[in-house]
């Protein structure tokens, strides 16, 4: 079974491309969805989050305030690393379980979609890595539009991840998503055609 890592950066358009791949009938394991699922499946994670970061990220019912916590770890990269040290082993384990399930039913190719695939060394378990690339000015502009952030806030969030330029060094295939949707679609069609070689 061929394992393809799909990664990108904030506002690079990775989610749109992931959706296009799914629509083509290719199985996609989404690390963001798994990150939400493991919080429910493994109560130990939130116990460790409370012990490490304090109770103020939980409301009066004890529910986790994800948005506030997300904003906090984006502002303080060392805090994000601490959180990833807690949650990543669970995410990796769940991805591995899902990959084995696909392998059991003789799936030929699976895509693992993860924004921090490279930062968390998951690219090493992939047969190839596809990077959704966009220039930094487009990233900043899209973030301001999507998330209503100031230019300074957008730059801080972008800088909290490994740069797309650095990620290029790890990629086998690069999708340039800085143009219009038609150009991106052409590249996706080429990618899907390439995938058929393995299916």
Curated annotation (Swiss-Prot):
Pfam families assigned: CoaE
GO molecular function: ATP binding; dephospho-CoA kinase activity
Keywords on record: ATP-binding, Coenzyme A biosynthesis, Cytoplasm, Kinase, Nucleotide-binding, Transferase
Pathway: Cofactor biosynthesis; coenzyme A biosynthesis; CoA from (R)-pantothenate: step 5/5
Function as written in the Swiss-Prot or TrEMBL entry: Catalyzes the phosphorylation of the 3'-hydroxyl group of dephosphocoenzyme A to form coenzyme A.
Entry-linked PANTHER family: BIFUNCTIONAL COENZYME A SYNTHASE-RELATED (PTHR10695:SF46), DEPHOSPHO-COA KINASE-RELATED (PTHR10695)
Protein name per UniProt: Dephospho-CoA kinase
Originating species: Clostridium perfringens (strain 13 / Type A)
Gene: coaE
């Amino acid at each position: 079974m061929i394992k393809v890592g799909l990664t990108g950066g904030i506002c690079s358009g990775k989610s749109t491309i992931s959706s296009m791949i799914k629509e083509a009938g290719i199985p996609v394991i989404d690390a963001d969805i798994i990150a939400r699922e493991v919080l429910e499946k493994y109560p130990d994670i939130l116990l460790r989050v409370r012990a490490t970061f304090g109770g103020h990220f939980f409301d009066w019912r004890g529910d986790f305030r994800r948005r506030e916590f997300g904003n906090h770890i984006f502002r303080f990269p060392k805090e994000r690393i601490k959180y990833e040290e807690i949650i990543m082993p669970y995410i990796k384990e769940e991805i591995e379980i899902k990959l084995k399930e696909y392998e059991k039913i003789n799936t030929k190719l699976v895509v693992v979609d993860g924004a921090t695939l490279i930062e968390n060394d998951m690219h090493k378990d992939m047969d190839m890595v596809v990077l959704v690339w966009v220039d930094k000015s487009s990233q900043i502009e899209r973030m301001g539009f999507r998330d209503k952030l100031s230019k300074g806030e957008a730059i801080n969030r972008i800088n909290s991840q490994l740069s797309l330029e650095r990620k290029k060094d790890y990629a086998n295939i690069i999708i340039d998503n800085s143009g219009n949707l038609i150009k991106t679609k052409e590249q996706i069609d080429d990618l899907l055609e390439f995938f058929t070689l393995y299916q």
